[in-house]
Amino acid sequence: RPLCPDGLVSGNGEQRLITSGAPYSDTLIYQNIHFILPNANPRVTPDTADELESVRQAIIKKGSYTDSQPYLDVYGYHPGAQLRIRQEEREYSGFMRYTNYETAEVGVRYTDDKGQWDRRTFTSWADGVTITQITSSDKEKPVTAEFTFDNISSFAKFGDGSEVDIRYKKYADKDGYMTFVAHYPSYEGSELKEGGYATVCYIISEGADVKTTENGLPDEKQYAGSSNPGLKVKKADTVYVISVSGRT
């Protein structure tokens, strides 16, 4: 049961990304192939030894057989952090989302009264990170954008599973680092009850400073932080977002 909406995808086999490609409120959903979400079901191996002979005979006789064991003990994949990039909304035209199969990039291109804008993302195999580039417009208008992590409760299909028992925090500093760190549910018998996951984003702003912002605390029991910070870039020539996700 996926927790991610449709979008453009990028990845290198371990690090993965889904981006919505919206012009002024884009979302970048970071993933890692090792992210699996525990559930509260018993972690026991089913005893199926007494079914072996009947299954063998069914195969030999080309008959049918039914597996009545429910797979409730299987852990499912889950997303990492969901980064939101906000820019001032304007009337726009020429909107296009694209995948460049030669460069392995996904991106969005559109035009407003400040010119044509291009935002592109790819996941590096050599470096094991995802990189997003936001360049100034073709009219040389600079980049102004705000970066925040979305709350878990806003994720697609939230509330249908054990994600309601995750606890998480957000961090950001003036050096350009943003971190989303979460603790898995502490279910009895779970191999991951002491573990969690994190997504770290490093924002590089050419020609402008990075400043911290403060947003209202999330109104949800999952949030364990004392603040809800983000970062803002104003009038930059180019902005890079370098991101990586992993288990903790």
What annotation goes with each model-predicted range?
Residues 1-248:
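Aromatic-residue-lined binding/catalytic grooves and analogous aromatic/hydrophobic interfacial grooves
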